[in-house]
A protein has these predicted regions:
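ATP/Mg2+-dependent ligation/transfer catalytic cores
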Residues: 1-180, 199-202, 345, 383-444
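Core alpha/beta catalytic barrel or barrel-like domain that forms the active/cofactor pocket
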Residues: 125-136, 171-191, 221-238, 278-286
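Accessory "access/gating" subregions that flank catalytic or transport cores
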Residues: 161-165, 169-175, 189-196, 207, ...
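Active-site-proximal beta-alpha loop/turn segments in soluble metabolic enzymes
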Residues: 140-151, 184-199, 228-233, 247-252
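Helical (often loop-to-helix) elements that flank the catalytic cores of nucleotide-handling enzymes
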Residues: 149-157, 198-214, 242-275
Length: 444
C-alpha cells in the first residue's frame, strides 16, 4: 500500500439487480458517517444490471435516503495487490429519520429472520457456495481446457487462488475452499457457516473481493449463471440449517424420513410449495433459466432429494469419520439460485417460505430418488413434482400468482423488483441466447 495514498472506505448496498453500489469516504469521514450514513436515492434501487433506470418505477426522480453503515459488516484486506487496501462496509438503507426503508433487501432479510424467531423460536445458520468463471481472454488463460477439479487447473492461474484465499481470510470471511471446478476456467468459493445475515454479507464480500483479485491478475471474474451459452453454468448454492433458542441444532432427527426434524421437514415443505413463486427472487436473470434445466446439475423441478445434485432442495450428507456426530453437520442445500439474485432477498424468500411451511404444519415433502424428467406426468403429479418456470418472465408471472409470496414483501419493493426485471427482459429482446449470455457474462 502506497504511503502517499489514503485508502477509501466504500459504504455500500446491494440492489435488486444484485449489483453492489455505494460511495467512498476517507477513514476520517467514514467515522463521522457511522451515525448519519451517506446520501442515497430511491431510484437507485431501480438500476438494472445494464446501467439503465427501469421506467416506470415507484420512485421517479424524487426522494432521499441514507445508507447507514454496519461496522459488523466491514470487509477489509490489503492483500489484493492494489495500491490501496480493499475496504467495504455494508449498510442498511434508511429514511432520513433513521427508520428502516421498506425496499431495502438487507432490512427484509432481517425482518424475515425476526419473524421466524418470533413464531418458532428458531434461527437460521447459512452459507453460500458461489461459482465463477475467469472469462476467456483473461491473462494467462489456457489455450485448451484443463482437467476439471485438477491441481493443474488450480495452479495454472497461480497465485490467483492463494491470493484470493488470503484476501478472504484477512477480510474475515472465513473461506473454507477456493477450488477449480468442473467448467473451463471455473472456480468455486465456500465459506464457514454462520448466522444468516452474516452469510449474505459474506456472499456480497466474496463477489467483490474476487473481482478485485481477478482484476489485479489481469483477468475478469464473472459470476453470471451462463457466461457463455456453450459453457457450464455458475450457481449459488445456499446451505441452511435451523438452530433452537439455545443455539443447538434443530434440523436433524435420525428417526424421521431423510433425517429431517419435524420443523425442518415443514420448513422444506414450505419452500417446495412456494418454489415456483420465489424462484424469480433466487434466480433473477434472463439466462438463469438456460441453466435451470434437466440434466444440468442445477434444478428444474419442485423436488426434495437426498444427496442428489439435480434436486432443488438437496439433503446433504454427514461424515462419521473419527466418530463425528451428524447433528451439527446436517443441512439442506437450496440449488435454484445464482448471482443475478440479491443474496438478502433470495435468503429472505427461502426463510419466508420455510416459515409458512412451519406455520401451516405441512408434512415433509416426499424424498424423490429418481429423475423427474423421465417420469410420467401422472407420477410427477403424485409426487408433487412441478417444472420450475422456464423463463424469467414466467418466473415473474408465477411470483405474481402466489398471494403468499406477494404478501411477504412490501409492495414498493416488489414493484421495483418487477420493474427492474421486466426492463432487463426488454433490453434482451431480439438477442439470441448466446448474445444474452455474453451480455450478462460481462456484467456479473
Amino acid at each position: 500500500m502506497s504511503a502517499a495514498l489514503a485508502p477509501l472506505v466504500s459504504i455500500v448496498t446491494t440492489d435488486l439487480a444484485a449489483v453492489t453500489r455505494g460511495r467512498p469516504l476517507t477513514e476520517a469521514r467514514f467515522r463521522k458517517a457511522l451515525e448519519t450514513g451517506i446520501g442515497w436515492v430511491p431510484a437507485n434501487q431501480c438500476l438494472t444490471a445494464f446501467n439503465t433506470i427501469a421506467d416506470p418505477n415507484p420512485w421517479g426522480s424524487s426522494g432521499d435516503l441514507r445508507i447507514l453503515p454496519d461496522e459488523a459488516a466491514r470487509f477489509t484486506t490489503a492483500a489484493t495487490g492494489t495500491a490501496t487496501r480493499f475496504d467495504m462496509v455494508i449498510g442498511d438503507i434508511v429514511e432520513l429519520d433513521g427508520s428502516p426503508w421498506t425496499a431495502c433487501p438487507r432490512t427484509q432479510l432481517r425482518a424475515a429472520l425476526r419473524a421466524l424467531e418470533a413464531a418458532t423460536g428458531l434461527g437460521l445458520v447459512a452459507t453460500f457456495e458461489q461459482e465463477f468463471t475467469l472469462l476467456p481472454g483473461a491473462a494467462g488463460a489456457p489455450a485448451v481446457p484443463l482437467h476439471a477439479f485438477s491441481v493443474e487447473a488450480l495452479r495454472h492461474f497461480d497465485p490467483f487462488a492463494p491470493r484470493l484465499a488470503a484476501c478472504l481470510e484477512q477480510a474475515g470471511v472465513e473461506p473454507e475452499m477456493v477450488l477449480a471446478e468442473y467448467g473451463a476456467n471455473q472456480f468455486e468459493i465456500t465459506h464457514a457457516p454462520t448466522d444468516a445475515l452474516t452469510a449474505a454479507d459474506r456472499a456480497v464480500a466474496i463477489r467483490e473481493i474476487t473481482r478485485e483479485v481477478a482484476r489485479t491478475a489481469g483477468a475478469r471474474a464473472s459470476f453470471a449463471p451462463k457466461p457463455a451459452l456453450d459453457q457450464v453454468g455458475n450457481g449459488v448454492h445456499i446451505h441452511f440449517s435451523l438452530r433452537d433458542a439455545s443455539g443447538q441444532p434443530a434440523t436433524f432427527d435420525a428417526a424421521r424420513p431423510g433425517r429431517l426434524s419435524q420443523a425442518a421437514g415443514a420448513f422444506c415443505a414450505g419452500i417446495v410449495k412456494h418454489l415456483s413463486g420465489i424462484v424469480a427472487l433466487t434466480a433473477s436473470g434472463v439466462p438463469s433459466y438456460y441453466r435451470l434445466a434437466p440434466h444440468n446439475w442445477s434444478s428444474s423441478y419442485t423436488w426434495l432429494g437426498e444427496r442428489d445434485r439435480e434436486a432443488t432442495l438437496r439433503i446433504c450428507p454427514t461424515v462419521t469419520i473419527g466418530g463425528r456426530e451428524p447433528e451439527r453437520q446436517f443441512n439442506v442445500e437450496y440449488r435454484a439460485a445464482d448471482a443475478t439474485a440479491n443474496p438478502y432477498l433470495a435468503l429472505a424468500a427461502i426463510v419466508r417460505a420455510g416459515l409458512a411451511g412451519i406455520e401451516a404444519d405441512l408434512a415433509a415433502p416426499p424424498i424423490v430418488g429418481r429423475d423427474p424428467s423421465v417420469m410420467s406426468a401422472d407420477e410427477r403429479e403424485r409426487l408433487g413434482l412441478r417444472r420450475l418456470p422456464e423463463t424469467l418472465e414466467d418466473a415473474l408471472d408465477a411470483m405474481a400468482a402466489d398471494p403468499a409470496v406477494m404478501a411477504w414483501f412490501p409492495p414498493e419493493l416488489l414493484a421495483s423488483f418487477v420493474a427492474v426485471k421486466r426492463s432487463e427482459i426488454g433490453l434482451m429482446a431480439g438477442l439470441d441466447r448466446a448474445a444474452v449470455c455474453a451480455a450478462y457474462g460481462a456484467r456479473y
